[in-house]
UniProtKB/Swiss-Prot annotation:
Gene Ontology biological-process entries: water transport
Name this protein carries in UniProt: Aquaporin TIP4-2
Chain ranges for the short sequence motif NPA 2 as given in the UniProt record: 204-206
Bilayer topology term: Multi-pass membrane protein
Gene Ontology CC terms, in alphabetical order: membrane; vacuolar membrane
Length: 257
């Protein structure tokens, strides 16, 4: 009888449902918090600098510089802060650009993107309340810029962002892997200066999604999805195919589900 009881107990132990991946849950929560902070900082800085003018109106260089610096600092610090927890993506284009080369699982990538979009929406809704209804700047094409031109611009800007990410962080030969996440802020700032008056230099579908959702302005919004996702994916393929000599590189995140 005792043996029978022991066998039953053992069977329950073995059939017990697997524990949830706590690391994945923490990573998704980190993406939620980090993306919220990034979008909140970027959008509020744009509002404070007076970047919420008429759609297509060029920003003065001082305004553009202020917006670029805010995004560069926020991106560099927040990516560094979350790198050891989630990889510090903050951006669906980064997540997809890393996914295409197998550095993250499809399920985790999907959860990351959902968290990033939710965070961006919450940040912009809160900002509308805290700012007393100030105009929320929405990414829009500059005067005379056609959608296809804007699309190509976003492809190139995001390509450079992911190319730098692969070169400084994912490539095992990189000599700056420990500070690579912080340095990514520099390319974000440079690209913001380069493309700010053409497309707004989004490079990040989540950064564009929140303001569009909060204001209901979706004009040419597809440009800010297709461009960054295509640019990020191309960068992943190009860098690993042509420049990643050691194919036994370490994945960005160990223990992905």
């Amino acid at each position: 009888m005792a043996k029978l009881v022991n066998k039953l107990v053992d069977s329950f132990d073995h059939d017990e449902a697997p524990a949830p991946d706590v690391g994945c849950v923490r990573a998704v929560l980190a993406e939620l918090v980090l993306t919220f902070l990034f979008v909140f900082t970027g959008v509020s800085a744009s509002m404070a600098a007076g970047a919420g003018g008429k759609p297509g109106e060029a920003m003065p260089m001082a305004t553009l510089a202020a917006v670029a610096i805010a995004h560069a600092l926020a991106a560099g610090v927040l990516v560094t802060a979350g790198f050891h927890v989630s990889g510090g993506h903050l951006n669906p284009a980064v997540t997809v650009g890393i996914l295409v080369r197998g550095h993250i699982t499809k399920l985790r990538a999907l959860l990351y993107v959902a968290a990033q979009l939710l965070a961006s929406s919450l940040a912009c809704i809160l900002l509308r309340y805290l700012s007393g209804g100030m105009v929320t700047p929405v990414h829009a094409l500059g005067a005379g810029i056609r959608p296809m031109q804007g699309l190509v611009m976003e492809v190139i800007l995001t390509f450079s962002l992911l190319f730098v990410t692969y070169a400084m962080i994912l490539d095992p030969r990189s000599q700056v892997r420990t500070i690579g996440p912080l340095l990514t802020g520099l390319i974000v700032g440079a690209n913001s200066l380069a493309g700010g008056n053409f497309t707004g230099a989004s490079m990040n579908p989540a950064r564009s999604f929140g303001p569009a959702m909060a204001t209901g302005v979706w004009t040419n919004h597809w440009v800010y999805w297709i461009g960054p996702l295509l640019g990020g994916s191309l960068a992943g393929f190009v860098y690993e195919s042509l420049f990643m000599v050691n194919k036994t590189h370490e994945p960005l995140l160990n223990g992905d589900i």
